[in-house]
A protein has these predicted regions:
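Acceptor/aglycone-binding surface of glycosyltransferases and processive sugar-polymer synthases
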Residues: 115, 137-210
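N-proximal low-complexity "stem/linker" segments adjacent to membrane-targeting elements
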Residues: 2-53
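A conserved acidic beta->alpha catalytic loop
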Residues: 68-83
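C-terminal catalytic/acceptor-binding lobe
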Residues: 227, 231-234, 238-317
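Short beta-strand-to-loop acidic/aromatic patch adjacent to the donor-nucleotide binding site
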Residues: 123-136
């Protein structure tokens, strides 16, 4: 009897040791969006993937990076030896490649963030990294040297969403589109939310952001728009009293010519209006008199959109 009791006591004294194991550290999941149009010069991508390689080597803090590549890009470059070598020797070496057929860039986000989310756990952070910026320049290298601070803000401050803001002057086409197009339309359809969003950022369509696990789960389970998804996430964060922050990225660009074409400007404004109209209907269609209110807002929105296109046509020349 004494032997049995002693054995039991010894077993019980060892059992709690399992409970002393260190809790899992929340990780950051990098999601790289490969350029839809492969640039002839690989210097920007080479610099970007030097950073990705460093992230991949820090597995205690970062999950294995994911790179989303549109299948149309692969087919367009299937006979390009430099592309094939860079894909195999660099992209696949330092990240898991997700090949996907995508309507637009935001669908690439959806695929990549969805894959990362399924690998993640509560408390993790998901970091979107656009691949089509001039990272090979002196300014771009400086940005890459501190871009990791963006997801760290979400991780340390327990924010739901952190938006990265590109530094631009008042004549920059992206700045002009957001001022005269995006925010003007936001104030038309969602005035209260627009005022709140502007407290946090001047770039409601930014491609740089990081998002917390629980907030991403909520967003993934709702309608995902093929464009202007950052704006949609900001609207959701404001509506749910989420915690939003911003990070100043720096003066980098994804415009090789330095400015947008008029056709691109018009397309971006049209897309913004289309998303806002759809989102407003989804939120208000159960209310009394919503159809009449929608027609009034639609007329106002049309006037705002036309004015924005006219202003930007003159400013972007």
């Amino acid at each position: 009897m004494n032997t049995t009791a002693g054995t039991t006591q010894k077993s019980q004294s060892k059992a709690p040791a399992k409970d002393l194991a260190a809790p899992r550290r929340n990780k950051i999941h990098p999601v790289v969006i490969y350029p839809y149009r492969q640039p002839g010069d690989f210097s920007d991508l080479e610099e970007l993937f030097r950073m990705v390689a460093a992230l991949d080597a820090s597995r205690d803090q970062y999950a294995r990076p994911i790179t989303v590549v549109d299948r149309k890009t692969c087919y367009a470059m299937e006979s390009s030896k430099p592309f094939i070598e860079f894909r195999k020797g660099t992209v696949a070496k330092y990240s898991d490649i997700l090949d996907a057929w995508c309507v637009d860039t935001c669908q690439m986000w959806y695929s990549g963030l969805g894959m990362a989310f399924e690998r993640g756990e509560p408390g993790d952070v998901y970091w979107l990294i656009p691949g089509d910026f001039n990272y090979g320049t002196a300014v771009g290298k400086d940005v890459l040297g501190r871009l990791h601070d963006l997801p760290q803000i979400v991780l340390e401050l327990r924010n739901d969403l952190c938006i990265g803001e590109i530094e631009t002057d008042h004549c920059n086409s992206k700045q002009l589109i957001d001022t005269y197009g995006t925010f003007a339309l936001l104030y038309t359809w969602f005035p209260d939310e627009a005022r709140e969003i502007r407290r946090y950022t001047e770039r409601p369509r930014s491609e740089f952001f990081a998002v917390r696990h629980a907030f991403l789960q909520a967003v993934l389970c709702e309608r995902w728009y093929p464009y202007e998804q950052t704006m949609v996430m900001l609207l959701r964060a404001v509506a749910s009293n989420g915690q939003i922050s911003r990070f100043f990225v720096g003066n980098i660009s994804d415009l090789p010519q330095g400015k947008e074409s008029l056709a691109s400007v018009m397309q971006q404004i049209d897309r913004t209006e289309r998303v806002l109209k759809t989102l407003w209907r989804e939120r208000n269609q159960g209310r009394d008199g919503w159809a009449e209110r929608y027609r009034v807002l639609e007329q106002q929105s049309e006037e705002v959109r036309r004015a924005a296109v006219l202003i930007l046509q003159n400013l972007c020349q």
